[in-house]
Amino acid sequence: MRLMISVLAICIGASLGALARWRLGLWLNPGAVLPLGTLAANLIGGYLIGICVAVFQALPNLDPVWRLALITGFLGGLTTFSSFSAEVVGMLGQQRYALGFGTAGLHLFGSLLLTLAGIKTATFLIAFNT
């Protein structure tokens, strides 16, 4: 039974994350030189995983199914390393080196900074509410 609950949590989370990424692409990608939908998905995912990391550390007794639903499922469906990689390789293949490497930098450093910001935000809010 526990296995089925875990599978269901991952499936629901992944479906919702993928739908959110799809909507971001529809909203932000049409005609954009830089695929902003993919960037937004990865940056939002970076921030949200930071929040999740801090919350799960602060609440160690929280049912692990939440980690599966939120991190493995939702954030796994929302963020996309493969699309980011294909977009950057496409830019480099078109000899748009500045755009390609700039995009790679935005994804990498932006996600790292927003993950740290998410951890700091959640840590502050947890400390503020205790």
From Swiss-Prot:
Localization annotation: Cell inner membrane
Q: Where does Na(+) bind?
A: G76, T79
What GO terms describe the biological role, i.e. biological process, of this protein?
cellular detoxification of fluoride
Recorded hits in Pfam families, A to Z, give: CRCB
**First-listed, main subcellular location of the protein, grouped into a coarse class:** membrane
Documented activity regulation: Na(+) is not transported, but it plays an essential structural role and its presence is essential for fluoride channel function.
Provide the leader sequence positions: none
Query: Where are the membrane-spanning stretches?
Result: 7-27, 36-56, 69-89, 99-119
UniProtKB keywords: Cell inner membrane, Cell membrane, Ion channel, Ion transport, Membrane, Metal-binding, Sodium, Transmembrane, Transmembrane helix, Transport
The UniProt record lists the keyword Ion transport: yes
Question: What are its GO cellular component terms?
Answer: plasma membrane
Catalytic activity reads:
fluoride(in) = fluoride(out)
Per its record, what are the GO molecular function terms?
fluoride channel activity; metal ion binding
InterPro entries recorded: FluC (IPR003691)
This protein's record includes keyword Chaperone: no
> What membrane topology does the UniProt entry give?
Multi-pass membrane protein
What family classification does the UniProt entry report for this protein?
Answer: Belongs to the fluoride channel Fluc/FEX (TC 1.A.43) family.
- Name the PANTHER family on file: FLUORIDE EXPORT PROTEIN 1-RELATED
Q: What does this protein do?
A: Fluoride-specific ion channel. Important for reducing fluoride concentration in the cell, thus reducing its toxicity.
Protein name, per record? Fluoride-specific ion channel FluC
* Gene source species: Albidiferax ferrireducens (strain ATCC BAA-621 / DSM 15236 / T118)
**Gene of this entry:** fluC
